[in-house]
């Protein structure tokens, strides 16, 4: 599947958002870098998925708590509370994408060097009895 020009710009915007977020974290939670990274991530996500799909993703009933905490963290970061906003935003991010964790773990099990460690962490030991 080929990406449209808008989706290609969205991928670049999302990558820049991750870069600015990482730079903001490394610079001791620098507020302007975190704010810029947040805005670029959200705009990139909207460009990749499209407006209607993004709105339906964030407004689903089972993801409402994650959406509220994610956008609350984004607003806290924008209003000069970067540390609190970052952690609230991370909580929202984990709640938004928690349905994808089994898929990510099953993919990581197939990666050659990471797979055995993931198997040790996620598999349980059955008792011999």
Curated annotation (Swiss-Prot):
Taking the first listed entry, what is the main subcellular location of this protein, grouped into a coarse class? Golgi
Q: Which InterPro entries match?
A: Got1, Vesicle_transpt_Got1/SFT2
UniProt topology in membrane: Multi-pass membrane protein
**Topological domain spans for side Cytoplasmic:** 1-8, 52-67, 112-129
Which GO BP terms sit in this record?
endoplasmic reticulum to Golgi vesicle-mediated transport; Golgi to endosome transport; intracellular protein transport; retrograde transport, endosome to Golgi
- Per the record, ranges on the Lumenal side are 30, 89-90
Taken from the record, one Pfam family name reads: Got1
Protein name according to UniProt: Protein transport protein got1
